[in-house]
Amino acid sequence: MLKIGVIADDFTGATDIASFLVENGMPTVQINDVPTGTQPEGCDAVVISLKTRSCPAQEAIKQSLAALVWLKKQGCQQVYFKYCSTFDSTAEGNIGPVTDALMVALDTSFTVISPALPVNGRTVYQGYLFVMNHLLAESGMRHHPINPMTDSYLPRLMEAQAQGRCGVIPAQTLDEGVAATRAALSRLQQEGYRYAVLDALNERHLEIQGEVLRDAPLVTGGSGLAMGLARQWAKHGVSQARSAGYPLSGRAVVLSGSCSQMTNQQVAFYRQHAPTRDVDVARCLSSETREAYAEALAQWVLSQDSELAPMISATASTQALAAIQQQYGATEASHAVEALFSLLAARLAEGGITRFIVAGGETSGVVTQSLGITGFHIGPCISPGVPWVNALHAPVSLALKSGNFGDESFFIRAQREFQV
């Protein structure tokens, strides 16, 4: 029987939480889009990767409920709605509406909000969300192009988009332990609260959350809570849980589409050590020039024989990105570059590339779709929340990195620390 079923609102976020489950002893498979078949064998948890983070609430609800139907058919014991640790959802967002829809479908009147991921600098204190010691609304998320986060107080954010009152379980209560936390949650529920934001400043707080919530029908949050829950559910050692996703041997490539601050640092560092080509957006705009350009880039990648994998980068600084968007249009430029990566990934796979290291959520989704990958086994972590994975039905390994995850040397470590 499936122990945990995760409904994740974007691709790299799904891989992120899957890696935390594996690293805490739960063999895990990630499936892209709503599954149609039966549960893959040999796993205790399934993560369903949707593309609902930025879509209208009704569409997000529809897809999330479809995923829930499949999980119920597999006998899933606990449902986990996973969203970003920066709570990417304004009053017009869909975290609240999806949470409410799942609560109705699971016949539960109370759930938790736990976006914290302390290992990556996302903490919650007194209900306020912090990113690297800055309040959410004072971090780079205040400039997010789709979901600008201008408030840091999670209960207020939740109440603006959901159907009930939201309370807080403060860090002091978590410090008192499991019994105190369980009692505080019970009090909020009795007082008519529908949601409870859980503070978390450290790993111990997440462990307490996991113990308290082991039998909850529905939890919501980022990846941190998954660590606490997995430690309650796990029956396997970490090495056994990782084994199915250990990277294959073969040639590798780095494809970078994210323009986040960390990815800019990673690309700048990596280009000092490996052959690199930057994407020319002008050559991506029409289908005719794009196809020829993708072929030229593929031939260049396949001709390299360096120790470290060649890199194709569309990563740009904030100023350079603004100039590109002004010249070509933000949507047009983004779609053109992703279309290039789609063509390029398919051509590289045909040419014998078996390991793809990809930066950026949208780019990761495009690459896996282009390669026809519908799901994969989760392997060992390169950085917190970024594992190697192996495709379920193809000889392909991928490292799929959300924009701001990983350290400066991520692209190098992904290769040198996992040599076959």
From Swiss-Prot:
* Positions contributing to ATP binding: S258, G360, G361, E362, T363, G403
- Pfam families from the xrefs? NBD_C, SBD_N
What is the top EC class of this enzyme, as a single word? Answer: transferase
EC nos: 2.7.1.217
State the Gene Ontology terms under molecular function.
ATP binding; kinase activity
Phenotype seen when the gene is deleted: Deletion mutant is unable to use L-threonate or D-erythronate as a carbon source.
Keywords carried by this UniProt record: ATP-binding, Carbohydrate metabolism, Kinase, Nucleotide-binding, Transferase
The coiled-coil segments of this chain are none
Source organism's superkingdom? Bacteria
Role noted for this protein: Catalyzes the ATP-dependent phosphorylation of 3-oxo-tetronate to 3-oxo-tetronate 4-phosphate.
The name this protein goes by in its record: 3-oxo-tetronate kinase
Q: Which species is this UniProt entry from?
A: Salmonella typhimurium (strain LT2 / SGSC1412 / ATCC 700720)
